[in-house]
A protein has these predicted regions:
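Conserved phosphate- and dinucleotide-binding cores of soluble alpha/beta proteins
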Residues: 38-195
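N-terminal active-site beta-alpha-beta segment that forms phosphate/nucleotide-binding
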Residues: 1-64
């Protein structure tokens, strides 16, 4: 799969760092696009060229980790605070693959992980009020990121739409129907989930 690919999309996290090492060990002459400073650093150390996302005409495949993924490949990417840029690369890619261990796979996304909103700083107060109307308890992570905690989520698609329609919201950490596959590492080996 990797041999025919020139430009990779790479997210952030420890798993992606291991993937970078694999790419280098496999002797692949590739370029990468990534929003992660840590991944950029690892790529630089390994001699993998990182190009600006705007300079990537085509991304065949992008790999990323996540906080939680359900059986329909919906995922939360709430931890790193770079979900907007990760989602741009995911949408650019012809195939978006999540790399996770078995502990991150759930039947349905639950409310243990917050939905994080990237917001225009001047809209943080307004967005907070609108999110509260949708049933969220809101915690400000910083001036651009709001963490939304819900007691329950009945309809992921509707929640995703409702949050994106709030003026001042740039993007959400809910990756609804974005991933095409997940590579899951477990005690019994590797399995592939796909939509």
């Amino acid at each position: 799969m990797l041999s025919l690919i020139h430009i990779f999309g790479l997210g952030g996290g420890e798993t992606i760092s291991y993937l970078c090492e694999y790419i280098k060990e496999a002797g692949k002459d590739v370029e990468a696009v990534t929003p992660s400073d840590q991944t950029k650093k690892v790529c630089k150390q390994l001699g993998i060229t990182v190009i600006d996302t705007n300079d990537a005409k085509e991304v065949k495949i992008a790999f990323d980790g996540c906080d939680e993924v359900d059986q329909n490949l919906n995922a939360y990417k709430s931890g790193g605070g770079i979900h907007t840029k990760e989602k741009i690369i995911a949408k650019m890619a012809q195939e978006y693959v999540l790399l996770v261990d078995e502990t991150k796979v759930v039947e349905e996304l639950d409310c243990k992980v917050p939905v994080v909103l990237e917001v225009v700083p001047e809209a943080a107060s307004y967005v907070t009020g609108e999110a509260q109307k949708l049933g969220a308890r809101v915690k400000e992570r910083d001036e651009k990121l709001l963490e939304l905690y819900f007691e329950e989520i009945k309809d992921l698609r509707q929640l995703d739409q409702d949050l994106k329609q709030i003026t001042g919201v740039i993007e959400t950490s809910l990756f609804y129907q974005v991933a095409s596959k997940a590579v899951v590492a477990g005690t019994d080996g590797i399995r592939i989930m796909q939509r």
